[in-house]
Regions:
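A conserved FAD-binding loop/helix module that cradles the flavin
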Residues: 190-202
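Mobile, glycine/GP-rich and aromatic-enriched active-site lid/loop segments adjacent to catalytic centers
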Residues: 1-181, 186-189
Length: 202
């Protein structure tokens, strides 16, 4: 990752290495001063699958209940509007994007969190930062706690000292027999999920 970058030579963008860029805060600031409405404080993009293809992760919708169809639909509309502004910004302010165009967008909005079960074990941020080990481990993860503030603002990143275990008990609801739950609704605190939800635990 590259943070707080003001300029990267164009030839670096064309390198075939896999990489993620997080930064260009000054460009965001200048664009906002020029009237751009950008939902994040940083420019975020990563190499795609094809040469000269970049994936952008800059849309944000906060403070909605994604279990409510009306709010979810409104969020999809907001994301579409944000995407248009983000493309305009990239072409005007980021070196190498001058002739960029949109090839495709995600078919639906990515939701980081809605409901979580209360399982036989609740994984916490203490487990993550203490690199917890469990006898019933089913996955190992190590991504930082990538906290996107639900009511607005940017995100915070808290690094894990090492990998941690996710126990099987996080998948077993306390009060329902015969059910195993996987994905973003497993038994974890908000902060623990901010790490474990990110691809890909092994």
């Amino acid at each position: 990752d590259v943070y707080d970058i003001d300029f990267i030579p164009n030839e670096f963008f064309r390198a075939d290495d896999n990489c993620t860029f997080v930064g260009f805060r000054n460009q965001i600031k200048k664009a906002r001063e020029a009237g751009y409405k950008l939902p994040v404080e940083r420019t975020i993009f990563m190499t795609g699958m094809a040469p000269d293809e970049w994936w952008v992760n800059m849309s944000r919708v906060n403070g909605i209940d994604a279990t409510d169809p009306a709010q979810y639909t409104q969020s999809e509309i907001i994301c579409a509007e944000q995407n248009e502004e983000i493309v305009r910004y990239l072409k005007a302010y980021i070196p190498g994007f001058e002739n960029a165009y949109v090839d495709r967008v995600a078919p639906f909005m990515g939701i980081r969190e809605t409901r979580r079960i209360v399982g036989e074990y609740i994984l916490t941020e203490d487990d993550i930062f203490n690199c917890a080990r469990f006898d019933d481990v089913i996955a190992v993860a190590s991504y930082p706690v990538d906290l996107h503030h639900p009511v607005g603002g940017d995100c915070s990143l808290y690094w894990c000292p090492d990998c941690y275990d996710i126990p099987y008990r996080c998948l077993i609801p306390q009060k329902i027999d015969g059910l195993i739950v996987a994905g973003r609704n497993v038994s974890m605190t908000h902060l623990a999920l901010a790490s474990a939800r990110v691809m890909a635990p092994a």
